[in-house]
Amino acid sequence: LNFKKKNILFVFTTIIICFLFASIYPINYIKKNTQVFTPLNTSFKDSGDYKISKYVYLTFDDGPTIVTDVLLDVLKTENVRATFFIVGKEIVGNELILKRIYNEGHGIGLHTYSHNFKKIYRSTEEFVNEMKKTSNIIEEITGSTPKIIRFPGGSSKRLNAFTLTNLHKNNFKVYDWNVNLCDGVNPNLSVSQLIKNSKIIKGNKNVAIILMHCNSNNKNTVKALPCIIKHYRDLGYEFRAITENTPEYYYKFKTEKNLTVK
């Protein structure tokens, strides 16, 4: 009888251990395959062996548009590199602007093809497919294959372990922001308000990832940009474009749910 009890206990214990291992796999996979810069980090480490005290990433979503072209003029005058998260459907008719972004050394990221929230957030598969579609179009035009992405509206409440693991399997890296001009929800904000918003850094003050937009109605963003650049330059920040070597930055998410990886 004691022998049977011991066998039952052994089998039960083995099942529990296997279950726990399967549950934590996605989390371990993410940790091993991702270098993540979170809002709570106190320092930012480059892909090299040295630490940079202050970094600023100027990022523009929703292009390419005519406004993108004007922004590029400002960036060229200021000798600053930025990153543009491209919406696939906006490329048609703006191929030369996309080429200019690439030729002038700016970062190019993916911002889905349709920017249709109901469609892209229907499933992880749909989301990944839209990123791939936009990446393929950009590759045809520039010869480069972007792998950095940004969620329309940000990853908060949309990213989980399952989705992140699938993105990493496709070599995509996620980048949110910790400075928000609020020019997406309100493109008509005054230039002075946009400049004020650009100075509010959430989390690690040594790294500013600034969210801006380059829709056709973001003319005030263009006007504010020189002052934003001057502000961070005066504070000693170094301007960089996001590349595949830049540590990921995405908002924290709960790992208790959606842990099954197919």
Spans of features found by a protein language model:
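Terminal accessory/targeting
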Residues: 1-57, 73-82, 205-262
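A generic signature of intrinsically disordered, low-complexity regions enriched in glycine/proline
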Residues: 11, 65-66, 187
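Generic "edge-of-domain/loop-turn" microfeature
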Residues: 26-29, 65, 91, 156, ...
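Active-site beta->alpha N-cap acidic-glycine motif
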Residues: 33-122, 126-140, 145, 231, ...
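Catalytic domains of cell-wall/extracellular-matrix polysaccharide-remodeling enzymes
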Residues: 115-233, 237-238, 242-257
